[in-house]
Amino acid sequence: SEAVAEKEDDPNFFKMVEGFFDKGAAIVENKLVEDLKTRGSPEVEGNLTFT
């Protein structure tokens, strides 16, 4: 049962998931920013703040 507990907390798995999440979030973020630029009216765009 100790071997099972070690596999559940495998830091390599968490690093791998975190890496995939970061890459996916960067792709989605760029797409969302582009969509906001093309769809927003000038009034709305003036109120948006990107950090």
Swiss-Prot record:
Organism: Electrophorus electricus (Electric eel)
Binding residues annotated for substrate, in chain numbering: 31
Principal subcellular localization: mitochondrion
EC identifiers of the protein: 1.4.1.3
Protein name: Glutamate dehydrogenase
Keywords assigned by UniProt, alphabetized: Mitochondrion, NADP, Oxidoreductase
Family, as annotated: Belongs to the Glu/Leu/Phe/Val dehydrogenases family.
Record note on quaternary structure: Homohexamer.
A single MF term (Gene Ontology): glutamate dehydrogenase [NAD(P)+] activity
Top-tier EC class: oxidoreductase
Listed GO biological process terms: glutamine metabolic process; tricarboxylic acid metabolic process
The protein's role, per its UniProt record: Mitochondrial glutamate dehydrogenase that converts L-glutamate into alpha-ketoglutarate. Plays a key role in glutamine anaplerosis by producing alpha-ketoglutarate, an important intermediate in the tricarboxylic acid cycle.
Gene Ontology annotations for the cellular component aspect, listed alphabetically: mitochondrial matrix
Domain of life: Eukaryota
Reaction catalyzed: L-glutamate + NAD(+) + H2O = 2-oxoglutarate + NH4(+) + NADH + H(+); L-glutamate + NADP(+) + H2O = 2-oxoglutarate + NH4(+) + NADPH + H(+)
Subcellular localization(s) per the UniProt record: Mitochondrion matrix
